[in-house]
Amino acid sequence: MLTSTDTGSLATGAGRRFVVVASRYNARFVDGMLEAAITTFQAAGAPTVDVFRVPGAWEIPVAAAAVVRRPGVKPDAVVCLGLILQGETSHARHIGDSVSDALMRLSVKQVVPI
C-alpha cells in the first residue's frame, strides 16, 4: 500500500538528472513503486525522470551499469525497483544478495548514488 510522503524535506531536484530502473516481473507491485518514485521526483522539481524497464531483478545491475556509463549523460542518482518473493528455497536470498552487492559496488565505483 502506498502512503503519502512529505516531499518538503527533499533537496530540490531542479536541474538534476534522475533515472529509475524497474523490473517488469511482479509488475503488480513494482508499477506502484515506479509511479510513486516518479511522482516524488516531480514534486521535488526534477524536470524529467528517465525510466528503463528490465525483465526481472537479476537484470537491474546490468541496466544500472549501462545507465551510469553512458557518455555525457551521467545521472545524479539511480533508483532501482524490483521485488523478489521468498519461496520455499533460499533462491530469493541469493538473488537479493547478489543484486544488492552488485549495485553497491557499481555505486562506489561510478560515484553515483544507486
Positions of the model-derived regions?
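Glycine-rich phosphate/diphosphate-binding loop of Rossmann-like nucleotide-binding domains
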Residues: S9-P55
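Short glycine-rich anion-binding loops that position phosphate/pyrophosphate groups of nucleotides
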Residues: G82-S90
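C-terminal binding/interaction regions
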Residues: A92-I114
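Active-site rim loops that border cofactor/substrate pockets in soluble metabolic enzymes
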Residues: A44-V73
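Short, active-site-adjacent cap segments at secondary-structure transitions
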Residues: R28, E59-I60, L85-Q86
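Anion-binding alpha/beta catalytic cores of soluble intermediary-metabolism enzymes, centered on
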Residues: M1-A22, F29, A66-R69, S107-I114
